[in-house]
């Protein structure tokens, strides 16, 4: 697995990526991700989570023949790709807004088998506005959960 970081890069981000299982870390501001991926043999699949159409456009060149870019992050802008890259190397670009119910079940089953646990940042309910602002600014670390004074996360009643 290779991690390509597009923003908020740095030593702490690289250390986290390696701790989470990355074999390679590519800082897109320091190097060309497509060129670096090709030097590593090319990617079979690139999961593009960044909300940047411009960065998605540059990823196709990092694929090996037959590879695919799956775009799940969006900003509403166009993704520019050349037909030569698609046809001659049999590469593809796909998009998905959410997986199917079966995808969710498969993901949870895989998580149980691999003992994968979510990384959660808890925030007191009184700091909800600050937590929301951090989320909007892209400063939230993984998932943020609002908790009450007793430390319990609560949702709205279902009536």
Predicted regions and their residues:
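Rossmann-fold dehydrogenase core element
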Residues: 68-70, 81-121
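Cofactor-binding loop segments of dinucleotide-utilizing enzymes, especially the Rossmann-like FAD-
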Residues: 6-7, 74, 98, 149
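Short, glycine/polar-rich helix-capping loops at beta-to-alpha or helix-loop-helix junctions
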Residues: 6-16, 78-83, 103-104
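Short glycine-rich anion-binding loops that position phosphate/pyrophosphate groups of nucleotides
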Residues: 51-53, 75-76, 151
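C-terminal hydrophobic helical "lid"/dimerization subdomain
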Residues: 57, 101-159
